[in-house]
Design a protein with these regions (language model features):
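NAD(P)-dependent Rossmann-like dehydrogenase/reductase catalytic/cofactor-binding core
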Residues: 28, 39-98
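N-terminal glycine-rich phosphate-binding loop for ADP-containing cofactors
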Residues: 15-32, 77
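Alpha-helix N-cap/helix-start motif at coil-to-helix transitions, marked by capping-box chemistry
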Residues: 10-18, 38-42, 67
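Conserved Rossmann-fold dehydrogenase catalytic segment
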Residues: 1-14, 33-36, 58-59
Length: 98
């Protein structure tokens, strides 16, 4: 059986690639060329990861820091309503139970 470290670091890249693909598809939907959309999303993920590593801040704090009251980013909480957090946890559960 794969340990949790292996599950997070071995399977995690595929999950992140799915995020890149999905956000890239959203960019394409709104007129961004696919290659450019993937680059934009990949750079955003890289920047977010670097910021978390450099500051040591809890990811929830970093998320809240970029959400203005009644702003556009907080509208993205639709991801929570769609169950993204539970989906990731369920995916790791499936890996751990394989």
């Amino acid at each position: 059986l794969m340990g949790i470290g292996g599950a997070l670091t071995g399977c995690g890249p595929a999950f992140i690639d799915l995020i890149i693909e999905a956000l890239g598809d959203a960019g394409v939907k709104y007129g961004v060329p696919r290659k450019q959309a993937y680059e934009m999303v990949s750079q955003m993920i890289l920047g977010s990861a670097k910021l978390q590593l450099q500051t040591g801040e809890h990811p929830g704090v970093l998320k809240d820091n970029v959400c203005s009251p009644a702003g556009t980013t907080i509208c993205g909480d639709a991801l929570e309503h769609a169950g993204i957090r539970a989906g990731f946890i369920d995916a790791i559960d499936a890996v751990m139970n394989k």
